[in-house]
């Protein structure tokens, strides 16, 4: 079976390919009620980690829980050992991710609408996994690694807004013409925002550019509503302990998701705290929207580079030349404020997906379906470069290696060695030691220095001096970045350095690997780059 798996900040949605249709999987909760998602929640139930609906049931019994642990993946210095706080317990992030995907896979086999169709003896279902367009290498690696450890056969990883473009083309093919074959996917999820401009020619899709904000999503709207509820209750944020604050956020999330265009008031129960009892308060929806408008404006500011060259003012708003539509997807985009503000600016070209929370999962299922015939050329979406020592270690220079606009391989066609993008550089080393500090970044300034979101990827030490290479031989297996310890060894400039080759490979999932080779001695290091 071919699955599309949209790992969301608050909800995880799965769709599957079924003879040209792509239904969303329904999951059963503890009461055998059906839902079109699996909750992205973990709880500590008497020492055992539980996930999904079981975690929600444990949370209702007062057990400590954590929602939105996916957001930790967007932190600049995230590692497999980054900590998820579940009450007083600290659990490594990779352990939580793997446990979550394992619980999801078990639910698919035992408590879902497709349980009878999954072959338990045939290994994991063929799965295409979604990832935010601006996710760094570590986020991609950890998501992929956890999913594979849980037993899924991951055959591809597709950027979420690119996947939503497949769902748009599948559902609204008639809106795409030779004059209007551009689509802007506006993807506002629970924790991230991405906007991608795509050119659609039949089943061939190409990403022309993409921008986003790694930490902006539905969780932030929940905090705005929680702040308004506290104000209405006459309480202060510091009066609520961690678990009480988490309970209030959960209450606000449920209240927010129940809003309709006709809603005028929203009711929230503020938990007991600091000697005060629980209190039910009412917040005017207009007041909530006024406070949340700046969040929506932050998304339109982020996508401004996409629309600037296409925009022309009209009486009805901004007309976008050649654009068939701005397609609104993502669970947080269901808030009525979002399409209202976008339509006020862009007019009738704004189309909200009829299934905003499931659009990406459906698109991923289309990508997983070999018979669908879609192809995709995406962009790297974030720059990749290296800080190097110069002037005998007295200064540092920055070298951009991979531009954010780099066209990557066709991730839908399936991984093979031919699908990898390779960049090779050769030079004569000028020092006895090379210190490579690799980073990913969102932009560079006029001087070529990285700016905006900056995420360290790995520090690698490479001895250029043959004597140091003999003293520090590599292990047989691929060494971890930084495993060659030359701490305290002085950096010396030399005139007779070896010829060095740097070979960078970007796989279809967007994960970067580097091979460093001294072509004179044959000494080599190979690393898959992630923190």
Predicted regions and their residues:
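Gly/Thr-rich phosphate-binding beta-strand-loop-beta motif of the actin/hexokinase/Hsp70
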Residues: 1-23, 172-208, 252, 264, ...
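Conserved phosphate-binding catalytic cores of ATP/NTP-utilizing and phosphoryl-transfer enzymes
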Residues: 1, 155-186, 358-375
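Short glycine-rich phosphate-binding loop at a beta-alpha junction
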Residues: 115-132, 312-330, 515
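Phosphate-binding loop and its immediate beta->loop->alpha context
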Residues: 20-153, 159, 223-265, 269, ...
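Glycine-rich phosphate-binding loop plus the immediately following alpha-helix
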Residues: 37-47, 200-243, 283-304, 422-435
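Helical "lid/coupling" subdomains associated with nucleotide-phosphate turnover
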Residues: 231-234, 261-378, 424, 494-499
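Acidic low-complexity intrinsically disordered segments
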Residues: 285, 377-531
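Adenine-nucleotide phosphate-binding core of ATP-dependent small-molecule kinases
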Residues: 84-106, 110, 275-309, 468, ...
